[in-house]
């Protein structure tokens, strides 16, 4: 109910949440909350799922949309390190490799990939 109210108050054009088949429980819960609010809200917006660590944490992720993050990659790395409880030093190399791979898929140096949720009637 809180997520739905937030969406209806803020009226976003787009929301990015975690991929629902993620090995991290908190990520799965977040994804379900956002998806349910998206379905229940009377407000229309695009819903995208992002990946955390494909193959290790984000399972069965098949992108439908890519973004060139070459110009903002360094800022993204800085933002990672603000999440101090997660020990980003240990995963930064993996994230760089994933972003290089996604960049190759969209013909850039660094990229991010997403899956766009398609509306399906119940």
Where are the language model's segments positioned?
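Metal-dependent de-N-acetylase/amidase catalytic core
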Residues: 1-122
